Each structure stands twice: as C-alpha cells, then as structure tokens.
C-alpha cells in the first residue's frame, strides 16, 4: 500500500517536472522520458526501485571520468605551453649542412671543427730550472699508479685521464675571471682560451664514455681523483701559475704518449677498431664511416695543442709577465 502511494507521488512529480523541493525542473521535453522511467519503476516493484537507485549512484560518476581526464590533459597542455613560452626562451631549429636536424644539445654545429692532425707530436719542453724539474717529476710520479692500475686498458686509462685533464682549464679560467673582476682588467682573451680547453677536454670524456662503460669502482675512483686534483690544482694555481701551467703541459705530453700507444694496439688488432660514436663524428666533422682510430687520432692532436698552450702560458709567467700581456690562442684546440 505504501509502495503504491509512493509510486503515485513520484510519478506525479516527474510528470509535472518538479524536484523534491517542489521547484519546477528545466524543460517539458523531459516529461516523456520521466513517464517512461516511472512506468518501469512501477512495473518492476522493489527491483525497479533498486535498479533506479543503482543507476543514479553509478551513472554520474562514470560520466565524470572522461571529463576529469580531459581537464587533466588540458591543464597539462596549458602548463607545457606556459613553461616553454612564459620566459620567451625557445631553442630555434638547428640543422646540419645536409639539412638534417641537429641531434645534440651539448654543442652546436658552429662549435664543431676539424682537428689539425698535422701538428708536431714530438715536441717536448726540456726542464730548465728547479720549478720545471719539480713539475716534470710530479707528472712522472703520478703516472706510476696509473700504469699499475690500468696497464694496457687504454680506453679506461683515457677516461680517467680526461676527467683530470678537464680540470685545469676550468680552474685557471675561473681564477682569471675573478682576477679580471677584482682588478678591473681585461684578461687578454685567456679566460675564453682556458675555458675552451676545459670544454674540449670534457668532450673527449663524453666521447670515451660512449666507447668505454666504466664499472662502479672506476666511477668511484673518478670521484676521488677529481675531488683531490681539483682542490690541489686550485691551491697550486693561486700560489704559482707558472708551475701549474707547466704541470699541465707535461700532463698533455703524457696524454700524447698514452694515445699513441692506444693507436698502436688498434693497428695491431689488440683493440677492435669499432665505428666512431655519432657524437665524435659531429664534433670533429669526421666522415660518416669514421672508426675509433680516427677518433683517437683527432683527440691526440687536441692534446698536442693543449700542450703548446700551457707551456706557452708558463713561459709567459717565467718571463715575469702576466697572461693578459700576450695574445691568447683563442680557438686553438
């Protein structure tokens, strides 16, 4: 009896387009749908009411799911647009000479170059005074543990060498930069020259990492060596730039020797002459079919240039002058 009375009340409310508060609902177009809904409820009895309750509880949530997803995607799209355009910073499309897209973010096409492989590799600065001898003996002493640890694993040796070789240019460039700011003086281009050297050595390392996958203990060794060498060279450069540059010059001479031995093993077949990494081909403008031997050849030439620059810088200091008084070899990789 009560169910019949309730059905009649609901039917009249739906047909008249009113809600539970007595307010009239939106449109009369809903009335046929409401009438059909009411007939189903009455015909189904208790089951009909359960079906109606379940539908009202489930349908709105299901309808909201795609809307939430759309709102989320829209917010994400708006956020990405804001992040890339709000500050007005956007990278222009960079292409190679053949029109293909440039794949690297770490350097641009105008920073690539062809290394001068005809440079004299046999040059050696003969120690002339006590400080020169100290620098020379220090480098020879540092070579002993390197030979014992790496032996003829020249790929791993080169990786370790480049983590050290990239430090002096950064330290020297940084200290000259601070000196220029402190004394209101030009650097003579030496800040740029030394930072270019550091960047060039870093690219050597990025290339070697593509060829040699360092083990966990080698990574740990790199961490320790870099921490010790950076701080030691920082203090040395403050105390005596002439000795610091002379040590780097002798380090580069050792690097030339190591890469020469590397090439001997490549030529003898002891080390496989694998294809050159893509980053090396683009950085040194090598042929597309370049091999590892070509990469080691250009890296060795770079080390010879760094040898000349640092011995030259040390000679300037030994003559009692400052670096800014002599023209810096900018772009001299």
Swiss-Prot record:
Iron-sulfur recorded as keyword: no
Q: Where in the cell does this protein reside?
A: Mitochondrion inner membrane
According to UniProt, the reaction catalysed is:
2 a ubiquinol + O2 = 2 a ubiquinone + 2 H2O
Q: How does it sit in the membrane?
A: Multi-pass membrane protein
Entry's transmembrane regions: 158-178, 220-240
Any GO CC annotation of this UniProt entry: mitochondrial inner membrane
Q: What class of enzyme is it?
A: oxidoreductase
Q: Which family does it belong to?
A: Belongs to the alternative oxidase family.
Q: What does this protein do?
A: Catalyzes the cyanide-resistant oxidation of ubiquinol and the reduction of molecular oxygen to water, but does not translocate protons and consequently is not linked to oxidative phosphorylation. May increase respiration when the cytochrome respiratory pathway is restricted, or in response to low temperatures.
How would you summarize the oligomeric state and partners of this protein? Answer: Homodimer; disulfide-linked.
The name this protein carries in UniProt is Ubiquinol oxidase 2, mitochondrial
Q: Which organism is it from?
A: Glycine max
Q: Which gene underlies this protein?
A: AOX2
């Amino acid at each position: 009896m009560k169910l019949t009375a309730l059905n009649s009340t609901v039917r009249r409310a739906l047909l008249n387009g009113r809600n539970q508060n007595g307010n009239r609902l939106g449109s009369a177009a809903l009335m046929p749908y409401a009438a059909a809904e009411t007939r189903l409820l009455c015909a189904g009895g208790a089951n009909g009411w359960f079906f109606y309750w379940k539908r009202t509880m489930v349908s709105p949530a299901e309808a909201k799911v795609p809307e939430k997803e759309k709102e989320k995607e829209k917010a994400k799209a708006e956020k990405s647009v804001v992040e890339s355009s709000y500050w007005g910073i956007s990278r222009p499309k960079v292409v190679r000479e053949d029109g293909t897209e440039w794949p690297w973010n770490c350097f641009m096409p105008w920073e690539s170059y062809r290394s001068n492989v005809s440079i004299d590799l046999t040059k050696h600065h003969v120690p002339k005074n006590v400080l020169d001898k100290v620098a020379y003996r220090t480098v020879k002493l540092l070579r002993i543990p390197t030979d014992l640890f790496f032996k003829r694993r020249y790929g791993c040796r080169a990786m370790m060498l480049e983590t050290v070789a990239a430090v002096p240019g950064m330290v020297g460039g940084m200290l000259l930069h601070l000196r220029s700011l402190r004394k209101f003086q030009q650097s003579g281009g030496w800040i740029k020259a030394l930072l270019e050297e550091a960047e060039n050595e870093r690219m050597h390392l990025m290339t070697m990492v593509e060829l040699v996958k360092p083990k966990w203990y080698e990574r740990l060794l790199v961490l320790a060596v870099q921490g010790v060498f950076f701080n030691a060279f920082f203090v040395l450069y403050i105390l005596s730039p002439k000795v610091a540059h002379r040590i780097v010059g002798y380090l580069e001479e050792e690097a030339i020797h190591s890469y020469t031995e590397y090439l001997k093993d490549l030529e003898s077949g002891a080390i496989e002459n694998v294809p050159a990494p893509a980053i090396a081909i683009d950085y040194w403008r090598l042929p597309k079919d370049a091999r590892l031997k070509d990469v080691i050849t250009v890296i060795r030439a770079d080390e010879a240039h760094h040898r000349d620059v640092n011995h030259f810088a040390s000679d300037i200091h030994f003559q009692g002058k400052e670096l800014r008084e002599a023209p810096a070899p900018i772009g001299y990789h």
